[in-house]
Curated annotation (Swiss-Prot):
Region (Reductase): 169-457
Domain annotation FAD-binding FR-type: ranges: 172-279
Signal peptide stretch: none
Description of its domains: Consists of two distinct domains; an N-terminal heme-containing oxygen-binding domain and a C-terminal reductase domain with binding sites for FAD and NAD(P)H.
The species this protein was found in: Giardia intestinalis (strain ATCC 50581 / GS clone H7) (Giardia lamblia)
Top-tier EC class: oxidoreductase
Domain of life: Eukaryota
Gene name in the database record: hmpA
Cofactors named for this entry: heme b; FAD
Entry-linked CDD domains: flavohem_like_fad_nad_binding
PANTHER family with a match to the protein in the record: FLAVOHEMOPROTEIN
Protein's UniProt name: Flavohemoprotein
């Protein structure tokens, strides 16, 4: 049901009050909820609670919803009545719906259920009452507004669950997989090949760029179940998935996978999810995974069908472990287009040093045997002049600069309309986006993945 004018006005009037509370509001909300409903500690990433990434993401999303609630309600009314939605109205809300789609996929990956929205809503309203206002009319308005939003998420997440479950090799919630291969590829990165525990059964095709959620329960790690998402590095296939797991000082689950998971062990996995992927619809309107393609409301390249637009350049830009989802895209393009590829394809990678280049040999091999037109450029923050050879181990020393990538600025200036896919550490991603904006690249050609809770790059 659409929201009433009174409800909309009440929420709009208090949006700034919630924003003014800042992280104190969302920290209080999470503390209240996770204390009273400890079972949710099996769902939420507690590391993101400690570093405040999740509270910050929730605050930003909640305030954005409250400030956009009128336009969202109007759009919903048009859709419910089967009326056409003006393009300018969609454009106004593109950012909000992109974030919502990203959240819906993340929720699906951890198995969020409708009943959990009721728990979240109860604690959200209690936190508003404790920290913002006890006015009954305003609380009632927020309750209706939350129910409205929860309904949209529940409906979208059920669509995601159903689509995945109904595909060949698909499933819902979790499924057991066996570690078929485990290999160390750098000092801090292990590669895992995962196959179904039930021998001979198929796995769902992922969209190149998506991730898997790994579910771990081990008292050596935590008294609570831990869930982490890892980008799939393999090309879509019905036999196996590959992930590359990077270990850093704060990575508890990644460290567990490095130290305690061996070949033959079983892991629980959710199906592939994620709104960051290369859209590649074959003739007949089907996506690469055989499923109907979604409406292009998320940042996934949906505005361009790269199967049909064979000349559209693709630029893959990564920093550090951010190359993992882009490797899946590159492998996919190598299989789909191979030596017949006529589009320009760029692989641009920034690493700390040459020892951290996890997939150099594979990318070089793809360039030689599969995509001879692939244009590779490497930036190293630190160069060892006694060991690193320019033109072989790296191309440029220092931070990434797209202006220095041979042929890229000219391609953009010539109106070839490249699409840019980039992933990496936060500072790297801000720098890349700033460089693209300096070239006046429109948002519909900029696609990025954010590891962890979503936040704007600006």
């Amino acid at each position: 049901m659409p929201l009433s004018e009174d409800t909309i006005k009440a929420v709009e009037a208090t949006a700034d009050l919630v924003a003014a509370q800042g992280l104190d509001f969302t920290r209080a909300f999470y503390e209240r909820m996770l204390t009273r409903n400890e079972e949710l500690k099996d769902v939420f990433n507690l590391s993101h609670q400690r570093d405040l990434r999740q509270p910050k993401a929730l605050l930003d999303s909640l305030v954005a919803y409250a400030r956009s609630i009128r336009k969202i309600n109007e759009l919903h009314e048009l859709q419910e009545q089967g009326l056409p939605v003006p393009a300018e109205r969609l454009a106004e809300l593109q950012g909000f719906f992109a974030v919502a789609e990203r959240i819906a996929h993340k929720h699906a990956s951890v198995g969020i259920q409708p009943a959990q929205y009721q728990i979240v809503g109860a604690h959200l309203l209690a936190t508003i009452e404790e920290r913002v206002t006890a006015d009954k009319a305003i609380l009632a308005a927020w309750s209706k507004a939350y129910d409205f939003l929860a309904h949209l998420f529940v409906r979208r997440e059920e669509e995601i669950y159903t689509e995945t479950e109904s595909s060949e090799g698909g499933w819902r919630q979790t499924r057991s997989f066996r570690v078929e291969e485990k290999a160390q590829i750098t000092e801090r990165i292990f590669r895992f090949r995962l196959v179904p525990a039930e021998k001979g059964t198929a796995v769902a095709l992922h969209k190149p760029g998506q991730y898997l959620a790994v579910f771990v329960r081990d008292p050596r790690l935590s008294p609570h179940r831990q869930i982490r998402q890892y980008s799939i590095t393999s090309a879509p296939n019905h036999t196996y998935y590959e992930i590359a797991v990077h270990r850093d000082k704060q990575a508890t689950v990644s460290g567990y996978l490095h130290d305690h998971v061996a070949v033959g062990d079983l892991l629980k996995l959710a199906p592939p999810y994620g709104d960051f992927f290369l859209e590649y619809r074959e003739p007949g309107g089907q996506a690469a995974d055989g499923q109907p393609s979604p409406e292009p409301l998320a940042l996934h390249g949906g505005a361009v069908n790269f199967a049909a637009e064979r000349m559209t350049p693709i630029v893959l830009i990564s920093g550090g472990i951010g190359q993992t989802p882009l490797l899946s895209i590159l492998r996919f393009l190598a299989e789909k287009e191979g030596q017949a590829a006529i589009r320009p394809i760029f692989w641009i990678h920034a690493a700390h040093d040459s020892r951290a280049r996890a997939f150099k040999a594979e990318v070089d091999a793809i360039k030689v045997t599969d995509l001879p037109g692939l244009r590779t450029t490497t930036f190293l923050s630190e160069v060892d002049e006694t060991m690193d050879k320019k033109g072989e181990d790296y191309d440029f020393a220092g931070r990434i600069s797209l202006d220095r990538v041979p042929g890229l600025a000219e391609l953009e200036a010539d109106g070839a309309n490249p699409h840019y896919f980039f992933v990496g550490p936060a500072g790297f991603m801000v720098a890349v986006e700033q460089q693209l904006k300096a070239w006046s690249v429109p948002e519909d050609r900029i696609h990025f993945e954010m590891f962890g809770p979503f936040k704007p790059l600006q």
